[in-house]
Regions:
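Scaffold/interface architecture of coatomer-like assemblies
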Residues: 1-175
Length: 175
């Protein structure tokens, strides 16, 4: 029995240009204006970006400076090989720099389970705050987080690869 999500996705007409980077930029701009602490974007796309005005480096820089986490689902099985590779690389980069995750299901039917997994991830996120050392230069900085439990040993931690220090909003740093 098909779910409401499957029916909705089945009704989507997949044609024409794809401007996924522009869509992400617009969504990030919108989310940054919000008052909620947790800002998450779920991107579901069917193809390679071939219509965006923003360049990938600029989008990744924007995401690095934002507090928006991106989860990406690429329905790319119908794409030609090169387009699929390009779309996969983009979605992986966007998810990684923002501390999210990317998924590439073979069928539309798998999307509901992935959306449920993303919802679980979002509900189980923590925000880490720390004082930025004095003398820290403006710009991007690498950060690595490891966690260990006495009962379970090493834990899997997914974070952004770093943070962007800006003096006006630098203390405390998040993530």
């Amino acid at each position: 029995m098909a779910t409401e999500l499957e029916h909705g996705l089945a009704d989507v007409r997949m044609w024409g240009g794809t401007a996924v980077m522009d869509a992400i930029r617009m969504a990030v701009d919108h989310l940054r204006k919000g008052t909620k602490e947790k800002k998450v974007l779920l991107v579901i796309t069917d193809g390679e970006d071939d219509s965006s005005d923003i360049q990938q480096d600029a989008l990744l820089n924007l995401l690095q400076k934002s507090d928006v986490t991106v989860y990406a689902i690429g329905l790319l099985s119908q794409e030609p090989t090169n387009a699929r590779k390009n779309a996969t690389k983009l979605l992986q980069a966007v998810a990684k720099v923002s501390g999210g995750a990317s998924y590439f299901p073979s069928t539309v039917e798998e999307v509901e389970a992935l959306a449920t997994q993303v919802a679980h991830d979002i509900r189980n996120q923590y925000v880490l705050e720390f004082p930025v050392p004095s003398g820290t230069k403006v710009g991007p900085h690498s950060l690595r987080v490891n966690a260990e439990s006495k009962s379970r040993g090493k834990l899997t931690v997914r974070t952004r690869p770093g943070y962007y220090y800006q003096p006006a909003t630098a203390s405390p740093a998040k993530r």
